[in-house]
């Protein structure tokens, strides 16, 4: 049975659609889990979902827990879970966390924890001006400078949310599996939908990247990072994306915790 090291950290990212969790040892993620978000689950039910990720005989060896959430109700459930099952100290990452980021926004308290983690993760991992695109329930596009200036964010309906809304409202359009489109203009309903849904989202992202670069010509190099559950689907269609980094959010939470702790 796997033994945890003396420095083992559980990181939890609570989103609107999914909850992702990672176990970190010696600055490396060694295990990962993802499951659907639901306010109807109890702390005990969520703990049962964590069991495959954890060595339940060594819970006390997890000496720190890091959490970020954009769902307050789920945050309360998970804090109860930590109190009930763990003895580790819990660190919440939010806009008040002392990370050295300068937020050029009207009210930093409204910035989602995931956006903060993405920005900080990009800052620490890539040491460059960065565009971070996160494909989740919403698609977020944010820009942070190498010096740590959080310049702002664009929020659009996520690809799957947009597709679900279309299928729900259009009587003659049946739901389809979202896969890479094979044509630009479809000659049947399925291909037409795939092109409009997937290509349309990708072209929006490409345009945003180019517009951000146009507005920041003073930057020597801008690294564009794509993350989120469907990043692999969209990545081939967005030429200006440099990196697919599916762990940047969890990594960002972990790196934020390390920065605050030390």
Q: How would you describe each model-predicted region?
A:
Residues 55, 87-88, 168-175, 198, ...:
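Generic secondary-structure signature for well-ordered alpha-helical cores
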Residues 57-60, 125-127, 216-219:
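Glycine-rich phosphate-binding loop signature in dinucleotide/nucleotide-binding domains
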Residues 38-42, 111-113, 118, 123-127, ...:
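Glycine-rich phosphate-binding loop plus the immediately following alpha-helix
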Residues 219-262:
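Long hydrophobic alpha-helical segments typical of transmembrane helices together
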Residues 1-98:
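N-terminal glycine/serine-rich phosphate-binding loop of ATP-dependent small-molecule kinases
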Residues 55-111, 147-152, 158-159, 187-198, ...:
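Short beta-strand-loop/turn "lid" adjacent to the catalytic site in phosphate-handling enzymes
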Residues 33, 39, 181-223, 241-242:
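Adenine-nucleotide phosphate-binding core of ATP-dependent small-molecule kinases
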């Amino acid at each position: 049975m796997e033994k945890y090291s003396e420095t083992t950290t559980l990181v939890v990212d609570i989103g609107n659609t999914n909850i992702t969790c990672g176990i970190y040892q010696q600055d490396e993620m060694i295990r990962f889990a993802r499951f659907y978000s639901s306010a109807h689950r109890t702390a005990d039910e969520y703990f049962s979902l964590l069991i495959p990720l954890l060595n339940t005989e060594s819970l006390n060896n997890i000496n720190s827990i890091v959490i970020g959430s954009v769902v307050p109700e789920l945050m309360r459930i998970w804090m109860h879970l930590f109190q009930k099952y763990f003895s580790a100290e819990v660190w919440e990452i939010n806009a008040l966390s002392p990370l050295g980021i300068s937020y050029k926004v009207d009210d930093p308290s409204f910035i989602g924890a995931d956006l903060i983690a993405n920005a900080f993760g990009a800052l620490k991992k890539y040491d460059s001006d960065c565009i971070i695109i996160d494909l989740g329930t919403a698609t977020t596009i944010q820009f942070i400078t190498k010096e740590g200036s959080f310049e702002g964010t664009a929020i659009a309906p996520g690809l799957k949310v947009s597709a679900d809304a279309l299928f729900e409202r259009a009587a003659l359009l049946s739901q389809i599996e979202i896969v890479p489109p094979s044509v630009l203009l479809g000659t049947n309903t399925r291909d037409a939908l795939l092109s409009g849904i997937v290509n349309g989202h990708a072209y929006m992202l490409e345009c945003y990247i180019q517009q951000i670069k146009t507005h920041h010509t003073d930057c020597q190099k801008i690294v564009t990072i794509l993350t989120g559950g469907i990043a692999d689907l969209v990545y081939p269609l967005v030429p200006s994306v440099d990196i697919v980094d599916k762990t940047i959010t969890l990594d960002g939470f972990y790196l934020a915790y390390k920065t605050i702790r030390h």
